[in-house]
Amino acid sequence: MKCQRVLTYLRIFGTTMFGISLLVGISTAYIMGYQFFTTAHNHLSFGLYGAILVVHLIIQSLFALLEHRNMRRSLETPIKLNKSLALCIAAYQEDPNYLKKCLVSVKRLTYPGIKVIMVIDGNSEDDMYMMEIFKEVMGWDNSATFVWQSNYHIKSPEETDESYAESLQHVSRLVLSNRFVCIMQKWGGKREVMYTAFKALGRTMDYVQVCDSDTMLDPASSVEMVKVLEEDPMVGGVGGDVQVSKLHFYFSVRYWMAFNIERACQSYFGCVQCISGPLGMYRNSLLHEFLEDWYNQTFMGSHCSFGDDRHLTNRVLSLGYATKYTARSKCLTETPITYLRWLNQQTRWSKSYFREWLYNSMWFHKHHLWMTYEAVITGFFPFFLIATAIQLFFQGRLWNILLFLLIVQAVALIKSSFASCLRGNIVMVFMSFYSVLYMSSLLPAKMFAIATINKSGWGTSGRKTVVVNFIGLVPITIWFTILFIGIIYTIIQQTKKTFPQSEEIVLIVGAVVYASYWVILLTLYTVLIKKCGKRKKEAHYDMVLDV
């Protein structure tokens, strides 16, 4: 026991020093600006910091490839489908069409005897349509339903202590004695909804799968995730490949990259940072080891009501269990179709990322060093990028601004080209479009998320009643103002001094290259997507989900 404690302390010390050394090393390389080579008049250069980022991308891609190879090998692994499994669906003001498609896909799951519990966040007349859809799809005779005036943590004023206690028992009996259950309860947020499903199930299930009400599941999705948990008892949770059901190009290619490169790499080392809400599965025995702590999570004195899935994943990691990703398990989900809703979603996700980064750092020593390495690289990269942008925009040289834009698109094109080769689809090249969204919107949204990290809420409204929130435009406006001032400052500085002919030539060539890049990319987009690649929405489901 004493020896084990010493080893734990040594691991804590080792991972801490590794993380600090890595951050100090990267910061030093950035601040010193050491250059391996530079051209005359400093038009082009390649430094140590750039080399670090290139090596990171190469290593990340390599391990992602190795993990995909492991996934293909798992096809040969036979499993017994004899473990009990419950699917928990969280619903909140969902679009009726999305909800119906979700439930139809649930009925088509191939895992035998799966129990389905849908908990609706809200119990008013306006929410009743979701329960009606549940009964219609799952079967009027097969569905057990209950409209609860309270929830597990808030007692309705209309209930007495005795009736509240009876309601708690009734919810548990309903869930345990029926296969298809729908519960409407007092509004409390997504975490409250998930808690109800987990608590009512108790320890009666072997595995618990989570799903959002806008998600359409592949029939084999549950089987493939069970396979991962069955292969290794030290895997505590697993997530699948979340794809975008609407043909919204920028999001679909970005989702593919995030899951099949970034999370696949994390999965190779058993430390996936977030098992997504639309498609995830956990060992039920682990859930009940931290259920109360997960629900009662606080940050800066406030109860946390967002980042539920990421914190659930981190709780599994905190116990020393691995978290995995499998591309064999798939689903389709909806993404915000308007810019403001997307921005609010990204801000909410960024809040949970930075908050959970701090929590996650306490468990680095329980996992592979890659977990520490990637946390440092991805956690601090936005700050280095913002510093670089501001520095180049305020150096008083137009070429620096143009070079920054060229490098951003060059890196995006390299990453998207690799994704095209891996996926075998030229469509992935258009992921380079996403770099514009990242630089113009996601970066300032991340900073805004840090500034408002203790603000709670769902972050986005339900789909049936869309509420537009313009607060996300504040950091975007500030960011564009800073960059605009930098451009004006640079133009003024350039007019004060003689413009070298070599600089003029480089500027013209760079501008032509940048403009040509966008002309070619937009032309390809028009040809491949708008004409040749245009498909009906239903065709996207033909592969596995023609619902």
Predicted regions and their residues:
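Cytosolic, membrane-interface loops and tails of multi-pass inner-membrane proteins
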Residues: 353-357, 456-461
